[in-house]
């Protein structure tokens, strides 16, 4: 079954394995999440648990948010996300979910919002090849041809300049190197989406489970 927790990306560092290998890791700070609601097939059409992360003052919350959190005997939360595929029988409303639900060596998927890059050209945004840099070339970093004359329009799939980043991105099959329950930290091998202090969702890997079967 799927497990998950919400946290914030602290940054990257490196640690040494027992054999001396250098491992680049991303540190994620995941304070205890609270189960705010259990979604059931009878009432909602699907099964999921709703997790809340980071308290906010009641002054900054509206009445529905305060009432929803009160059902779980907790304060209103800044972030609320659902974890589908979880075994809802293992959870109760108001229960805390901590980093110790994961173990070292476990494979997870990490979801976050990618860094915003602003307005960028086709080369940086889509990885398109640039034009000749020779003196006689008439274009260097332009998108190039807009397509054939016959359609009398530009197709939607044409790679063009535009706003880059700020999108929901998931990196799959990352390995948990270390779990630190005392400091609520997860050390995950490699990089994860988003800037420092950005919200991330760590869930059990989908494809790794299929391979195991």
UniProtKB/Swiss-Prot annotation:
GO cellular component: cytosolic large ribosomal subunit
Location of the region described as Disordered in the Swiss-Prot/TrEMBL record: 124-151
Keywords attached to this entry: Ribonucleoprotein, Ribosomal protein, RNA-binding, rRNA-binding
InterPro entries: Ribosomal_uL3 (IPR000597), Ribosomal_uL3_bac/org-type (IPR019927), Ribosomal_uL3_CS (IPR019926), Transl_B-barrel_sf (IPR009000)
Gene Ontology biological process terms, A to Z: translation
Described purpose of this protein according to its UniProt entry: One of the primary rRNA binding proteins, it binds directly near the 3'-end of the 23S rRNA, where it nucleates assembly of the 50S subunit.
Protein name: Large ribosomal subunit protein uL3
Gene it is expressed from: rplC
